[in-house]
Amino acid sequence: MKNLDWGSLSFGYMKTDYNVRCYYRDGKWGEIEVCSDEYLKLHMAATCLHYGQEAFEGLKAYRCKDGKVRVFRMEENAARLQSTCRGIMMPEVSTELFCEMVKKVVRLNQEWIPTYESGATLYIRPLLIGTSAQVGVHPAKEYCFLIFVTPVGPYFKGGFSSNPYVIIRDYDRSAPLGTGKYKVGGNYAASLFANNLAHEKGYACEFYLDAKEKKYMDECGAANFFGIKDNTYVTPKSTSILPSITNKSLMQVAEDLGMKVERRPIPEEELDTFEEAGACGTAAVISPISYIDDLDTGKRYSFGEKPGPMSKKLFDTLRGIQYGEIEDKHGWTTVVIE
């Protein structure tokens, strides 16, 4: 294992030893290649550079208390990538190929997997890009699918603590029938200005309303939203929201804990009724929300300065499953290193 101060890692890129790649040419995927080079050689007219033909995923490997290394729900990431491929006209990466490459890259870089005690993890980033030259808006004929890994600390520096959010009305992350449900870079580019605006105003993240009516809660930055009231886990239903694997898992955990689950449109005024609220995603798992400000109306929706009891219970349960400390009765984790 590398001699690093695992406990002080930030959520950022660090070079590791290997990445894995697979190329799509002549209508089929080739063999998996192992590479130590951090760089890609790309044609200047590649479709990923001009027409946004790229998709990515994010998942994690955990070094657990029992010494094993587990990966969480990688088949779900494969399925979501396949959905994105269909949406932006790229060849699908089979679940078998996806999972084989995930396991291979984790094993190749096992010295970079943080210690159990540190709270840090190995972040896994699959990336699919159109590589063939194209002038004119058409799908590429050739593609590169690669996966790299990097050890990361908590996404938010304070760890599991509450953060303030702000509703941004002047910007939309995605259109109602656009690419919001796909994990493509363009959605994140569309969020950069609003995210910077939120940070300048002292908030952890921006909160988007639905692009069509500006009435319903959509996404919080790059994460899904949930609210808790009356022992019910409520999360938005929208065609412009990325289907979060973490949120999907939390909905199941909530049911396992005896909570009701509702996935439906959430009007802004309903925020007043929630006892707890949070953002969820692979990076932070759960980021509890202390309050949401609506600067246009002057309204503040408060959920408490500290994480609520149900948010903490959901977080602890899901983390326990990821780390192999709580029974994985849904078969979500895969042991990749014994």
What kind of feature is each model-predicted range?
Residues 97, 105-119:
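Charged, gly/pro-rich active-site loop segments
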Residues 115-129:
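Extended, Lys/Arg-enriched charged tracts that mediate electrostatic binding to polyanionic substrates
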